[in-house]
Every structure is written in structure tokens, then in C-alpha cells.
């Protein structure tokens, strides 16, 4: 009888220990993932306009958008940028969002992932920003080996080498174009490059006009789930 009680007691203790181990493992996973989850949550609140109080005296987004259009028109006339082939205009009507593109209007409510403050507005990236991808020049490893190591050479996830010349000499937003990091997010896919540097064709180069803050654009991209837009399996793009 004593042996039976001992066996029963040990079995009960083993069950408690097993349950404790399961809960301890779950707690460790939560602790490991919490910092990154909290960061993503804060980013999401920020891009939705919920992180800081909205000041009604702030300039509405439409006014900024008008300045952006005027500045881009000036740059087009000066030959510094090319005119958008397909100009997009997004507006609200009847509590829905519509886009006018190539003279055709369509509802885009299914493309707006969340509600935004009343004085904000949705725009396509090409409307608010300037794409400078045409200025990128890729250099092979063998080409780079022959160059002095002076200026940063950027790829999809950041600096991957140094070269003896540069293409850009102002802060610009770089967005990784391909690679597993598009889904894994072990590093930010959007980041600011500064100083004098070179960029290969694995990172998009984005410039801003009329006071658009590229740091906010980087936050928005890094808070966005790109899985629905990624193509390719061996090499996501």
C-alpha cells in the first residue's frame, strides 16, 4: 500500500512538472517575442494616427499634397524628374475612397487597410514621393574588389561593401527589393541612407519633396505586411 501511494504521488508530481514545463516554455516564447510584437504594435498605432494626439490646427494633408504636386511639376519642367505616366488622384465620396486613374474612377475601399484621421488622406507612393531607381548602378563582386574602400555600397538589407565613388549625397529612403528579409523581417526593409554612397539594383531609392518626412515613410513600410504583394519562392521579390 505504501509503495502504491509513493507511485501515485510521483505520478502526480510528474504531471505537475510536465504542465509547469509546458507553461514555462510558453512563457519563454512570449518573453522572446514580446519586444518585437510591442514594436510592431507601436508602429501600427503610429501609421494609423493613434500614437499621438491629433492637433486640429495642423495643416491638412490635402495642403501638403498640393505643395508636393507643385514641387514635382517644377522639377519636371527643370528636367530633374520624369512625369508620372499614370497620375493617381484618391478622394473620399459617400464615406468611401475612390481613385481616379487614367480618367477612370473606381472604389478602392478594399485597398485601404485601416481608418485614418479626418485631415489625413490616402495617396499612392508615386504621388507623394520621387523614385530614383534609374540612377542605381550594380557593381559585381569582381568589380568592387578592384576599388578602394571609401564609400558605403548598399544592397537590399543595408551596407554590403565599400567602393571608391558615390552616386548619392543626400539622405534618401532605401527599400529592399528582394530577398528573404521581405518576409522574415530580421532587419528593417526600409531604412535611411545618408552621407555619400552607392546603391545597387536590389534596393529601391526614394526621394521626398515639399517636406515629406522619409522617416515616417520608412515607419509605414516597416509596419506594413508585404506578404500579399511578394512574388517568388526561392527569391522573394
Language-model segments: residues:
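DNA target-recognition patches
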Residues: 97-106, 126-191
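Extended, domain-scale alpha-helical bundle/helix-rich regions
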Residues: 31-32, 36-109
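Short, well-ordered loop/turn elements at secondary-structure boundaries
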Residues: 37-38, 47, 147-150, 168-170, ...
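Hydrophobic alpha-helix feature that most strongly marks membrane-spanning transmembrane helices
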Residues: 11, 47, 130-133, 179, ...
Amino acid at each position: 500500500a505504501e509503495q502504491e501511494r509513493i507511485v501515485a504521488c510521483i505520478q502526480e508530481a510528474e504531471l505537475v512538472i510536465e504542465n509547469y514545463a509546458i507553461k514555462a516554455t510558453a512563457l519563454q516564447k512570449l518573453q522572446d517575442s514580446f519586444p518585437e510584437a510591442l514594436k510592431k504594435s507601436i508602429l501600427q498605432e503610429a501609421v494609423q494616427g493613434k500614437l499621438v494626439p491629433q492637433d486640429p490646427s495642423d495643416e491638412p494633408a490635402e495642403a501638403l499634397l498640393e505643395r508636393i504636386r507643385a514641387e514635382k511639376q517644377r522639377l519636371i519642367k527643370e528636367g530633374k524628374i520624369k512625369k508620372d505616366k499614370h497620375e493617381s488622384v484618391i478622394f473620399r465620396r459617400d464615406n468611401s475612397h475612390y481613385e481616379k486613374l487614367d480618367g477612370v474612377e473606381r472604389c478602392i475601399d478594399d485597398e485601404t487597410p485601416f481608418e485614418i484621421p479626418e485631415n489625413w488622406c490616402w495617396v499612392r507612393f508615386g504621388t507623394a514621393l520621387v523614385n530614383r531607381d534609374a540612377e542605381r548602378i550594380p557593381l559585381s563582386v569582381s568589380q568592387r574588389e578592384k576599388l578602394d574602400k571609401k564609400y558605403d555600397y548598399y544592397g537590399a538589407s543595408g551596407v554590403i561593401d565599400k567602393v571608391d565613388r558615390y552616386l548619392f549625397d543626400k539622405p534618401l529612403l532605401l527599400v529592399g527589393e528582394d530577398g528573404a528579409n521581405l518576409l522574415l523581417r530580421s532587419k528593417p526593409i526600409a531604412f535611411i541612407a545618408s552621407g555619400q554612397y552607392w546603391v545597387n539594383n536590389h534596393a529601391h531609392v526614394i526621394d521626398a519633396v515639399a517636406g515629406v518626412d522619409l522617416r515616417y515613410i520608412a515607419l509605414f513600410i516597416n509596419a506594413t505586411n508585404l506578404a500579399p504583394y511578394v512574388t517568388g519562392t526561392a527569391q522573394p521579390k
